[in-house]
């Protein structure tokens, strides 16, 4: 019994030593934990001076332009605007060379200056963009608009120019969003086709339909001048095209069955869509030329074919 007890203690001792070795002896095969953190992008500081005006209304217009440009660039996450209180030079820098050292002191990497005038019944705007550390002008543009209602659009265009010149990528500020607006109680929802600028500003919001009929699936044409969407009129779904220039709505076609999921071709000259045959209830894909209104059936099989879309080159349909 004593011998067995001694052997038992000895075995336990070896067992505990083995456990300790497993936990404390470094292994050449131990797992290597590597933590990769996301790179941090610091926003680029840009100074945007007041847009000087030659009258009360142009001064106000300049304030609107400056606010739009500043908000656009800041909201992109790639820029931040230097605080006005830090500005050392406050002159109109469109017609004179900036004192670049003054802008270096406040750590502005880029400087945007502009002015706005009302001449010959139109607003004329000039801008100059400077690279502060290089000490040189990198962009100069002159633009005009017929009325103040287009100031927001002009501000977005200037934002695009600045963004593209500095980043090398195309801007997206002069774009709009088409969507379905919903209001009212859950059992009586009113849905209207609506459009707004990409920044969602209330001044840019506009309803395109009156809400009497249900509207669905709006899509921009690549030319950004027309919208295709589906509307239930007299409980019948039809595809319509809305012209943003003149506000005219026209029906694409009065088809016998349900029509839905319209998409434009890259050149905005055709639409591909699907509609169902009321006799068979089968859904097929059709192609329509918007100039001639001719229709070609693309599919013919017992399955349900729907939600077509063009490839970027317009040669294929998925």
Give the role of each language-model region.
Residues 196-216, 242-258, 288-304:
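Multi-bladed beta-propeller domains
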Residues 171-173, 222-223, 266-267, 312-313:
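Residue-level detector of Asp-centered blade-edge/turn motifs that repeat once per structural unit
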Residues 30-44, 133-205:
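C-terminal/domain-edge helix-coil "capping" segments
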Residues 35-99, 112:
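Short beta-strand->alpha-helix linker/helix-N-cap micro-motif
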Residues 32-33, 94-159:
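Amphipathic beta-strand/beta-sheet edge segments enriched in Tyr/Trp
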Residues 170, 182-192, 210-213, 230-239, ...:
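A flexible loop/linker signature enriched in serine peptidases of the S9 family
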Residues 177, 227, 268-271, 314-318:
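Hydrophobic beta-strand positions that form the internal "hydrophobic ladder"
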